[in-house]
Swiss-Prot record:
It comes from the Bacteria. Pfam families: DUF134. CDD domains: Sigma70_r4. This is UPF0251 protein Sfum_2819. InterPro entries: RNA_pol_sigma_r3/r4-like, UPF0251, WH-like_DNA-bd_sf. Belongs to the UPF0251 family.
Length: 156
C-alpha cells in the first residue's frame, strides 16, 4: 500500500485553466492535465526563480518531493509543446489557495492560522506548549484530529 500524500500548500491561482494550440482544425487535440501542485512547483521554481529548498518549504513538502513534482510538470509541459497537445490545470491534491498556514498544538489540540509570510510559532497561544505541527489542510481537518502531515513517528 503506498504512503499517503502529504498536504501541499498552493498560493497562486492560475489565471487560465486551459490552453490549446493555436491554428488547430478538426477534432480537439489530446489533453494533458497539469495538477495544481505541479503548476505551483513550476510557478515557484521557474517563474519566481526560487531554489528548490525554499520552494519546497513554501509548498510544505521535502526538497526531494518538490524535485519530483517539478520534474513531472516540466515533462508534461515539454510534451504539450513538442506534440501540440492541449493543456489543462486542475486537481492534484493541493490544499487550495492558502494565504495563511494552519497550526495545531498536539498537547491541547488548539488550532490557529498565521499569515504565510510570518515565521513558524514557537509555542501554542492557548497552553504555551511547544509540541506543534503545521497542517497544510484546513483548520476543520486539523480540528477533527486527523493530522494531514504528522512529522513525528510513534515509538514501537
Amino acid at each position: 500500500m503506498p504512503r499517503p500524500k502529504c498536504c501541499r500548500t498552493i498560493t497562486g491561482e492560475p489565471p487560465c485553466r486551459a490552453f490549446t494550440p493555436a491554428g488547430t482544425t478538426g477534432p480537439a487535440p489530446s489533453r494533458v492535465v497539469l495538477s495544481e501542485d505541479e503548476f505551483e512547483a513550476v510557478r515557484l521554481a521557474d517563474f519566481e526563480g526560487l531554489y528548490q529548498e525554499e520552494a519546497a518549504e513554501r509548498m510544505g513538502v521535502s526538497r526531494q518531493t518538490f524535485g519530483r513534482i517539478v520534474g513531472a510538470a516540466r515533462a508534461k509541459i515539454a510534451r504539450v509543446l513538442v506534440e501540440g497537445l492541449a493543456l489543462s490545470i486542475g486537481g492534484g491534491g493541493g490544499t487550495g489557495i492558502a494565504p495563511s498556514r494552519s497550526y495545531m498544538c498536539r498537547l491541547c489540540r488548539h488550532t490557529w492560522d498565521m499569515p504565510s509570510e510570518t515565521d513558524s510559532p514557537a509555542e501554542c497561544p492557548a497552553c504555551r506548549g511547544r509540541n506543534l505541527f503545521r497542517c497544510g489542510a484546513s483548520l476543520e481537518t486539523a480540528a477533527s484530529g486527523r493530522e494531514c502531515c504528522p512529522r513525528e513517528r510513534k515509538a514501537t
